[in-house]
Amino acid sequence: KKVADYLISKAVEEYESDYHRYYIQGESKPIDVGMPFLVKGKSKNVGVLLSQGYMAAPREVENLARYLGSIGFCVYVPRLKGHGTSPDDLANRSYQDWVASIDRGYAIISSICKRVVVGGFSTGAGLALDLAARVKEVAGVFAVAAPMTLKDFSSKFAPAVDMWNRIMDKAYSVGPKMEFVENKPENPHINYLRNPISGVREIERLMDDLEPKLPDLDVPALIVQSRRDPVVEPKGSLKIFKLLGTEDKEYRLFNFDRHGILLGDGSQRVHKAIGEFINRI
C-alpha cells in the first residue's frame, strides 16, 4: 500500500507539472478532468487497471470505474502521457510514452490487489491488450472499441499530412506545417478539439506493434464493439478477437451508432457486461 501511495503521488505530481507547462487558455480542460485516480472497492482480491482513449482523459472512463467500484473492485485509472493537458503536449508523445503510463498504473494496482484485470477504451483498449500480451501475471483483459482499423477522416488524412511535412522540411521552408486537424468529439468537455497528426500515426504504430503479439495472449478476454462506430471499424475488433490465442474469449457487439459507448445512453449495459466478465474470471 505504501508503494501504491508513493507511485500515485508521483503520477499526480507529473500530471500537475505537465498541466502547468502545456496549459493553453481557453483550450485546456479543468485540471481535475485529467487527474489519475483510484476507486477503492470492498475487496483487494481483484483490481482493475482501466485506461482512457486517445485525445481524452481519465474522466472519460470514470463512470465505468465507479460502477466497477460499486460491485466491489478496486480500480486505478492512470493518465496517458500527453493527455489532460493540451494537444501541443500530445503532439510530442510516442505510443511508448503511453505504454510507460500503463505500466506504471499496473505497478500501482498490482501492489494493492492480488489479481489484476486490465481494460481500456479505444487506444486504451489497444494498450490493455498490449499489457496483457507482455505481462503473464494479468488475470484477464477487456477491450472496448479497440482501434485496429480507423475509419475517421483525420486518420486517413494522416499519411498525406506526414508526407507534406517531410517535403516542407526537405525544402528548408519555414512555411506552414499541417500538424493538427480539427476534432469534433462526442464529449467536448473531456476531449481535445485539435487532433495532432503525429498522434494518429502513434496509434497506428501501437496497433501494428500489437498485432503479432495477439496469438500469444492466453488470458480470458472480452472484446466489446459498437455496431455503427464512426471512428473505428467493427471488423478491426473482430480481427483482434480472431487473432487472440486464448480459448476463453468473448465478442460483444452493441447496437450503438457512436464511438464512446462507456458514456451516455445505454452505457450501463456495457458496464454490466464488463462487470459480469470480471466476476466470471
Question: Each PLM stretch: what is its role?
Answer:
Residues 2-4, 252-281:
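Catalytic active-site module of serine/aspartate enzymes centered on a nucleophile-bearing elbow/loop
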Residues 25-86:
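Short, surface-exposed "cap/lid" segments of acyl-processing enzymes
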Residues 64, 219, 233-242, 253:
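Short alpha-helix in the alpha/beta-hydrolase fold that links the catalytic acid
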Residues 85-112, 117:
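Catalytic nucleophile-loop/oxyanion-hole region of alpha/beta-hydrolase
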Residues 120-124, 128:
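Gly/Ala-rich beta-loop-alpha elbow adjacent to hydrolase catalytic centers
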Residues 142-153:
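Active-site nucleophile loop of the alpha/beta-hydrolase fold
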Residues 217, 223-225, 229:
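Short beta-strand/loop motif that positions the catalytic acidic residue
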Residues 228-232, 260:
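Acidic catalytic loop of the alpha/beta-hydrolase fold
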